[in-house]
Amino acid sequence: TWWCLLRPGKKTLQGGTFGIDREYSAEVLNAGENGNYRVRFHPVRDESVIDLSERLGVMPLPPYIDRTIDDPRSANDNERYQTVYADYDKRVAVAAPTAGLHFTPDLLADLEARGAQFHDLTLQVGIGTFHPIQVDNILDHNIHREWYEIPAAAFQSLQQPSPGPRVAVGTTSVRSIEDAMRRTRTAPETCLTPVGSVQAEADIFIYPPAGFEAVDALITNFHLPKSTLLCLVSAFLSPGDQRGIEWLLALYAEAIEHNYNFYSYGDAMLIV
């Protein structure tokens, strides 16, 4: 079974089934949180649900990117809205970690030639990343969970002195790393695997005046208004105090003044 976003969700749940003739049928089993529905798929062909979706589906872009199936730009989205280092055997995230979209194979090779070391994480970016804060006090916001895996070698590197600054690519990477550092310190039995990797659901909400244990610099795009990611970025701008909020507003004002591109296909900033 799969957790899916359905449109229209409630009406589909009442009907119980949907599908495409000679391709697949699907049963809607129950509703979950954040607009998710648990669905069991029955492909007509002998193929996996992932292969079925690759063959019939289109790239699930964020809701603020307006595309139709016949839009000529849609053909490029399959390549553009995916990092060059994505693991195709672990395709369950609802969105790309968009800070990584700026990297090309040539850029990665150039950075490695200059001495940079890379560690890959598995990030299952969740639909909650798009949910805005809708309360007056951020402490009342119900933060979303996102599953992640940090391989053993990467986690060992995080625990040792670094020869240079540790640069996280994207806010989801920061959240996962900081969650892992705290979780392995307080309850390692809940997340450490026998081979030394870390697997868990990040459930921490990072906002000023939070500090950071294992990340020294951050590459991140420009985010949506009222996003929890803005809270994380403002904390990262000035760890341990509230000054990052004012700095973040100034940075975004400058970006608007100079016509920077925002959101998934937009520009990025490097915070050191």
What are the functions of these language-model segments?
Residues 1-272:
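Surface-exposed, charge/polar-rich loops and edge strands
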